[in-house]
Amino acid sequence: MIRLETMKVVAQEEIAPAIFELVLEGEMVEAMRAGQFLHLRVPDDAHLLRRPISISSIDKANKQCHLIYRIEGAGTAIFSTLSQGDTLDVMGPQGNGFDLSDLDEQNQVLLVGGGIGVPPLLEVAKELHERGVKVVTVLGFANKDAVILKTELAQYGQVFVTTDDGSYGIKGNVSVVINDLDSQFDAVYSCGAPGMMKYINQTFDDHPRAYLSLESRMACGMGACYACVLKVPESETVSQRVCEDGPVFRTGTVVL
């Protein structure tokens, strides 16, 4: 159930150039699931629209969650100035999240993340690892300075890293690794830039458990304004809203 809450800032640090990890504390954490996002109000009077930021990790015991975001404009730049003890007006948790049901030690799962789309996969990896699921993760970044969460994800399984310029890991994009993987995966979870999502959507089009977590500009965040709609294959009238029906969609169910 979506709620409004004033959450407390526990900590914040810059983990890569213009990329920040923000730790929030509040009752809302108890309702959070992997793959959901929060809609944050910018703490000033000039920015009316909330900013959607995906949940990176969830600590229900301490009622804390981690958000990782990149400065994209004035709103997120203001978020980066927050420090311990500050508060944020938060709406959430929002979205359907990833379906992790019925996976156990007999299963093998592929996680694919690119750039600022990597953070929501951290909670997925953690929860799957706790169930004994074998996790293989493929990450794509522009260059070595943009690499995030590789060490954290390596706690939960094998991690491959690609960079566009070859400055870290394997040169190229995630397809270089995925096309060479011999393993069969029981589920695929992904989040990244539009080009990466199109590749995953096509490559795993007929996979019964392949999922895309999609990013979109949002206004209301409640499904009422239809600012974040996606078309559905073979339909001129039906659409899906990223904020309300997503952000997670099965491959082949939306047009990218």
UniProtKB/Swiss-Prot annotation:
Domain of life: Bacteria
PANTHER family noted in UniProt: DIHYDROOROTATE DEHYDROGENASE B (NAD(+)), ELECTRON TRANSFER SUBUNIT (PTHR43513), DIHYDROOROTATE DEHYDROGENASE B (NAD(+)), ELECTRON TRANSFER SUBUNIT-RELATED (PTHR43513:SF3)
Pathway: Pyrimidine metabolism; UMP biosynthesis via de novo pathway; orotate from (S)-dihydroorotate (NAD(+) route): step 1/1
NCBIfam families the UniProt entry points to: PRK00054.1-2 (NF000797)
Protein residues bound to FAD: 51-54, 68-70, 75-76
GO molecular function annotations of the record: 2 iron, 2 sulfur cluster binding; electron transfer activity; flavin adenine dinucleotide binding; metal ion binding; oxidoreductase activity
Record's cofactor remark: Binds 1 [2Fe-2S] cluster per subunit.
Subunit text: Heterotetramer of 2 PyrK and 2 PyrD type B subunits.
Cofactor: [2Fe-2S] cluster; FAD
Family stated for the protein in its record: Belongs to the PyrK family.
Keyword Cell wall biogenesis/degradation: no
Species assigned in the record: Streptococcus pneumoniae (strain ATCC BAA-255 / R6)
Binding site for [2Fe-2S] cluster: 220, 225, 228, 243
Coiled coil: none
Record protein name field: Dihydroorotate dehydrogenase B (NAD(+)), electron transfer subunit
Alphabetic keyword roster: 2Fe-2S, Electron transport, FAD, Flavoprotein, Iron, Iron-sulfur, Metal-binding, Pyrimidine biosynthesis, Transport
UniProt keyword Iron-sulfur present: yes
GO BP, one annotated term: 'de novo' UMP biosynthetic process
Reported function: Responsible for channeling the electrons from the oxidation of dihydroorotate from the FMN redox center in the PyrD type B subunit to the ultimate electron acceptor NAD(+).
InterPro entries in the cross-refs: Cbr1-like_FAD-bd_dom (IPR008333), Cyt_c3_hydrogenase_gsu (IPR012165), Dihydroorotate_DH_ele_sf (IPR037117), Dihydroorotate_DH_Fe-S-bd (IPR019480), Dihydroorotate_DHASE_ETsu (IPR023455), FAD-bd_FR_type (IPR017927), FNR_nucleotide-bd (IPR039261), OxRdtase_FAD/NAD-bd (IPR001433)
Chain ranges of the FAD-binding FR-type domain: 2-100
